[in-house]
Curated annotation (Swiss-Prot):
Superkingdom: Bacteria
Family: Belongs to the delta endotoxin family.
Name of this protein: Pesticidal crystal protein Cry1Fa
GO molecular function, one term: signaling receptor binding
PANTHER family listed in its UniProt record: ENDOTOXIN_N DOMAIN-CONTAINING PROTEIN-RELATED, PESTICIDAL CRYSTAL PROTEIN N-TERMINAL DOMAIN-CONTAINING PROTEIN
Organism: Bacillus thuringiensis subsp. aizawai
Extra remark: Toxic segment of the protein is located in the N-terminus.
Keyword Methyltransferase: no
Gene that encodes it: cry1Fa
Amino acid sequence: MENNIQNQCVPYNCLNNPEVEILNEERSTGRLPLDISLSLTRFLLSEFVPGVGVAFGLFDLIWGFITPSDWSLFLLQIEQLIEQRIETLERNRAITTLRGLADSYEIYIEALREWEANPNNAQLREDVRIRFANTDDALITAINNFTLTSFEIPLLSVYVQAANLHLSLLRDAVSFGQGWGLDIATVNNHYNRLINLIHRYTKHCLDTYNQGLENLRGTNTRQWARFNQFRRDLTLTVLDIVALFPNYDVRTYPIQTSSQLTREIYTSSVIEDSPVSANIPNGFNRAEFGVRPPHLMDFMNSLFVTAETVRSQTVWGGHLVSSRNTAGNRINFPSYGVFNPGGAIWIADEDPRPFYRTLSDPVFVRGGFGNPHYVLGLRGVAFQQTGTNHTRTFRNSGTIDSLDEIPPQDNSGAPWNDYSHVLNHVTFVRWPGEISGSDSWRAPMFSWTHRSATPTNTIDPERITQIPLVKAHTLQSGTTVVRGPGFTGGDILRRTSGGPFAYTIVNINGQLPQRYRARIRYASTTNLRIYVTVAGERIFAGQFNKTMDTGDPLTFQSFSYATINTAFTFPMSQSSFTVGADTFSSGNEVYIDRFELIPVTATFEAEYDLERAQKAVNALFTSINQIGIKTDVTDYHIDQVSNLVDCLSDEFCLDEKRELSEKVKHAKRLSDERNLLQDPNFKGINRQLDRGWRGSTDITIQRGDDVFKENYVTLPGTFDECYPTYLYQKIDESKLKPYTRYQLRGYIEDSQDLEIYLIRYNAKHETVNVLGTGSLWPLSVQSPIRKCGEPNRCAPHLEWNPDLDCSCRDGEKCAHHSHHFSLDIDVGCTDLNEDLDVWVIFKIKTQDGHARLGNLEFLEEKPLVGEALARVKRAEKKWRDKREKLELETNIVYKEAKESVDALFVNSQYDQLQADTNIAMIHAADKRVHRIREAYLPELSVIPGVNVDIFEELKGRIFTAFFLYDARNVIKNGDFNNGLSCWNVKGHVDVEEQNNHRSVLVVPEWEAEVSQEVRVCPGRGYILRVTAYKEGYGEGCVTIHEIENNTDELKFSNCVEEEVYPNNTVTCNDYTANQEEYGGAYTSRNRGYDETYGSNSSVPADYASVYEEKSYTDGRRDNPCESNRGYGDYTPLPAGYVTKELEYFPETDKVWIEIGETEGTFIVDSVELLLMEE
């Protein structure tokens, strides 16, 4: 029985346990490295200001007073944790190297002090240059020595100190190099080295840290204690310093910067100070369970603890924690362990002063002779508060001091003022111990955060303020908090679909309005748009590049900055700030580390804008002499750079503005010279027949706005895909070089269903949809238009990155997140006789389609070589082979078509039809004409093809035939092509379009009647000719009569056998078969009885060819609309139709034509009343 067992308290320092001896030594030797590292972190967080102060501070803080024995402690700290000793020779070499670095740095500091006191002294400038170079060389050598194979981990803490010193040294060269007499190219070289070394040093530190941590993973609690101490100590001595490396980028952080470390570190005296490894199944993982998963940052404001008695020992048994987020909202957590509210001891409740220290009294109790297993728990603990050192106690204070594990940031002052960390949360791991053969375990785990992570997000108007996004107060749906990669100073946020990340409240410490710029540090597996809202209003939206590939680990190089170039203000001293991402496909990953707010003054803004404009202008050219512009510099980009220059301040940089303006004008002229398009700025459309742009009449030219600096065009949708909205231009053969690739590119503000074609041997075709941004101007900007009506391109506006590009290739349907497009085409041999040219076409054939585009360019990209050259030669040969085949085919088809057309007329003057020419014969001839292929391009039927001349020649004669036929037929709309226009209707009838594209009159009821009054010449002879079809029983009748008698009629039934035209005979037995062949498919062209007297259609003036097979290459397609154009659409009548005629001699000047039936359905194809020849 437990109450009969004598408990024995075993002090841990009395056990003969070598592991305990090592840990005790760690506490005694590890303090100095922790003290120095925390002091350095404090210095980098608070004293990182422009000037020589950083160099002096590093010398005074570290390199000027640390002795060789102190450096030995840095090495010993990690050696003991990983149980790996550095060989004596390598240890001595490392310490000697560090001492040498300190001596070299001291000499450099002396030279720097002397130069600072007398910066114009040439000798002092030379001295500081020499000593900088010597120290730089020494650091390069030393840091390489600290990466000695097999000893990277124990050397890591001195590696990071040397790396930090090297970055500081290079920062001095970038900041003061020109003052030392270095030329700008050398200074820029040092800057590039600085950036590259930030990447390299960060990678080495993270790789080495992760390897060392992974090596310490184990299975029991003793191994976890060592694992956790390594994680905690190296966070303080390595990772925190690495997280501040980016601040050495003096061009990104030119003024004092406020940073925060949001990561958490853990202490647990029950586990870490235990003299034994607790006998607990899977103890390592159970201990690690006490580490909180990634979460938005919170700050503990209440703690209640209850005791539990385990084997006669009263220990911490459970607790209740509540916290507040950065918005001040309370967060209630589930209770930990066994919590009894009635017996809870109050530790803290709504107290704004956090705890900076714990004094713990762990107990390790073993049962008597009958029970050798331990009870491990916390018998008591005292909590000390910041500011006043006030103490709160659970039962009693102890001797295990958290300051031994997490020292103050400055040992010279009172720890309640100079503390480095505060207690942020308390978790609990518990093992019941009732299982036979195991210990009992009650282990509170204390979570600590660095004091730089403040409970609010306060913006300093004099500093760059970095706000980790993990300090938001509310996550948005779809956002998760993930473990930081180690170099960010805390956890980060992730999204895999578009939307806002989290809501953040910021407090402005200063008077309003203060202007700010913003940067977002992000990583992404896809191109995306990042947007920012302030107080619920979107102030920025910009396109940014991917920074990593899917599946890649998060590294320092994975992160980049999304910069808001437009200054903005906060409307209130406490405002919301939200970062979001969209316009990317779900499943990609987007990470946000932090956002940064940069205060802007008039001088700073002018200098920033000038520097940005200078970089943008210089980046346009291939060299500093500005002979040419880069191939990838688009015309749109030049316009945007011009806007940057135009918006520079006349007050601060007038001369520089004029110089840059001349350069950007030169770049624009060079862009115009290489552009093979005529009128790229859309001065007009259809102005010249064979030059410039041709387009449909619904296209409008718009003047420049906030997106386009120059004119652009708007293409609307169309209600009929056979009559698309189009814009095209021909690139003349004389402008093209043989065996060269050309590129079409431009800028699309927004589009839907915009088709882009490049045509030569074949058609390169893309359909491009670009999501529009709407207005670029945020709601807070009242007037983006100047007083004279021109757009104010200098006003704050929503931006996207003009440098992003999405280049489509043949066959793709691009859903562009970029507004740029590009499409290339290869040109083979050029021949002015063939005059093949290149056609540039933009087309929209849907009702919802639309596009706004400008800055179009067609320019030479590169000569063709290798595979590309072979491919274009193959395409050229294939095109010529098909061209020859087409010529042979065209000769045959043209001959047949011409014979059919000539047969319609009495002579070669084509001014009179043959007496027996009827409408069916004209249609048949027209169909043969339309068998001539390549009269027009299938991609756009207004562009002439190779056979356009002969096609138009015959089409003109077909039109003449129709005209003469219409003049000869005195019945108006006798073919019902215009519905029921000119006909009188009684009852219900309809005009329907059959599946062979012929319009017919359908009389479905016996009481219905259709009639027309026709004026004639008395005494002349006429022929009434009707082509019709009768369904069902009864008869269909077409009657001609005058007022008084003189009546004649044509009757139709499905049981009549007689001669028909053309050569069709019908019997009663044929009715069913004819029905099946015809199919009975009608499409109504009549909109109802009330519209019967209106004209429903007109004959189009443009008849393009019908293609019966694919054109020259597989890339060319038939135009489905060709079958709907002109009289060529008419096909021969289906079987069952008959043509009847009679002679009629009117006695008056008016006759009536009446159509009706007795039963069933009567279908009339055409009614003709032809004047006989004299």
